[in-house]
């Protein structure tokens, strides 16, 4: 179905809020499966029967960590060997059920799981409903249907639990594209991807909070250092602010990814330290601006992996080839945290100091208004010239040498 368009996440959330079933698919390089999803508060016999009839997979009940703790739903096994670490608990039936297997009795069990008065002793173990514990942080931590189910219920303003069921084709294999698309159209069912849900959360959830603000005299001039912490990961970042940002318009700004070797050691294997110095100098001269110092060492792969990549580069690989050889993308960085930091600082539009087109696109995707790109001009040296040429040729960086 070449003309097929996925639903808007907002429409999927509204359908969940109304008690409807939606269809959600994950990445092609993961399970590459579609699941039916609905909220546990609407685990009606009709919804369960639909899942059993058309999905034919295992009907599970994704729940938050809080619900699992409240009801003493413990992991099914001590050592999880599932390919995707799906967090099954011991299966359960509510004590008011008989065999527990009918759509009506599975409905009772699922709805009792989200009953405010429910307690651990209300459930028999084992049973016919299979709770799955979602990771804290949801699809931003694990891109699974378990997390998607709980995230969608939360975004719909409902209890943090739901139902999910894999969809099999008539021949018993897992239904994939384009058959999933055809099914969604035939049943007028909202259909989204987990990637869409991730992007929605990055744009709409508050994922970073400001902790402190202090004066920061530097060799470039006096700045104000604003500390931030990511809500999910606890990762810490800093914004160095110069001048008055009250109107928030056309602020000279840079996102600088942490580079211990370049920023602190003065390494000549990269131009990071030079770029940081140039940006600080330009903002000081301007009298107004922001540098976000993000903890994204080694284009997001971390310090040790960056040094491992250097080892591979010493053996003949370039910076892109080395990252890929270690199992990473050429650039693992994302900029939604930076965009939220700018927003919390009151920045509305920026003149971005960068040579990297991915930063421009990453910030634009988060709704930040970039009115101009200001180049960072540094002189290459004999140790980083090949590295810079690779970034120019393979990653599209905009250099003038």
Swiss-Prot record:
Which pathway, metabolic or otherwise, does it act in?
Cofactor biosynthesis; riboflavin biosynthesis; 2-hydroxy-3-oxobutyl phosphate from D-ribulose 5-phosphate: step 1/1; Cofactor biosynthesis; riboflavin biosynthesis; 5-amino-6-(D-ribitylamino)uracil from GTP: step 1/4
Region annotation GTP cyclohydrolase II: where it falls in the sequence: 204-401
The protein's site described by Essential for DHBP synthase activity is found at 128, 166
Q: Which GO terms describe its cellular component?
A: cytosol
Name the keywords, alphabetized: GTP-binding, Hydrolase, Lyase, Magnesium, Manganese, Metal-binding, Multifunctional enzyme, Nucleotide-binding, Riboflavin biosynthesis, Zinc
Whether Ion transport counts among this entry's keywords is: no
Supply the PANTHER family for this chain.
3,4-DIHYDROXY-2-BUTANONE 4-PHOSPHATE SYNTHASE, GTP CYCLOHYDROLASE II-RELATED
Its job: Catalyzes the conversion of D-ribulose 5-phosphate to formate and 3,4-dihydroxy-2-butanone 4-phosphate.
**Protein name, as recorded:** Riboflavin biosynthesis protein RibBA
Source organism (scientific name) = Actinobacillus pleuropneumoniae serotype 7 (strain AP76)
């Amino acid at each position: 179905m070449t003309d097929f368009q996925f639903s808007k996440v907002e429409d999927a959330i509204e359908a969940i809020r109304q008690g409807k079933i939606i269809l959600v698919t994950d990445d092609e390089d993961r399970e590459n499966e579609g699941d039916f999803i609905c909220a546990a508060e609407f685990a009606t016999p009709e919804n369960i029967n639909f899942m059993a009839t058309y999905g034919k997979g295992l009907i599970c009940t994704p729940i938050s960590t809080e619900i699992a703790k409240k009801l003493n739903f413990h992991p099914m096994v001590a050592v999880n060997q599932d390919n995707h670490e799906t967090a099954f608990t011991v299966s359960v039936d509510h004590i008011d059920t008989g065999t527990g297997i009918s759509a009506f009795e599975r409905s009772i069990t699922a709805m009792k799981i989200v009953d405010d008065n429910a307690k651990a002793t209300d459930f028999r173990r084992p049973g016919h409903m299979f709770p799955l514990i979602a990771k804290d942080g949801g699809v931003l931590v694990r891109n699974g249907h378990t997390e998607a189910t709980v995230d969608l219920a939360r975004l719909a303003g409902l209890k943090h639990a739901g139902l999910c069921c894999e969809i099999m084709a008539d021949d018993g294999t897992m239904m994939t594209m384009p058959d999933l698309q055809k099914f969604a159209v035939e049943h007028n069912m909202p259909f989204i991807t987990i990637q869409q849900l991730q992007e929605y959360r990055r744009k709409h959830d508050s994922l970073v909070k400001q902790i402190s603000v202090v004066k920061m005299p530097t060799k470039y001039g006096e700045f104000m250092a604003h500390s931030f912490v990511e809500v999910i990961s606890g990762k810490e970042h800093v914004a160095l602010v110069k001048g008055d940002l009250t109107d928030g318009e056309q602020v000279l700004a840079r996102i600088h990814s942490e580079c211990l070797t370049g920023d602190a050691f003065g390494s000549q294997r990269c131009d990071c330290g030079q770029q940081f110095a140039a940006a600080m100098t330009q903002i000081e001269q301007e009298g107004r601006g922001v540098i976000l110092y993000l903890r994204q060492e080694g284009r997001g792969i971390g310090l040790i992996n960056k040094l491992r990549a250097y080892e591979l580069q010493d053996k003949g690989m370039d910076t892109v080839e080395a990252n890929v050889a270690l199992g990473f993308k050429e650039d693992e960085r994302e900029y939604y945290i930076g965009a939220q930091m700018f927003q919390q600082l009151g920045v509305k539009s920026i003149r971005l100091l960068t040579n990297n087109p991915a930063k421009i696109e990453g910030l634009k995707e988060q709704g930040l208004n970039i009115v101009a790109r200001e180049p960072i001009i540094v002189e290459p040296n004999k140790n980083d010239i090949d590295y810079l040429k690779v970034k120019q040729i393979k990653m599209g960086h905009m250099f003038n040498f």
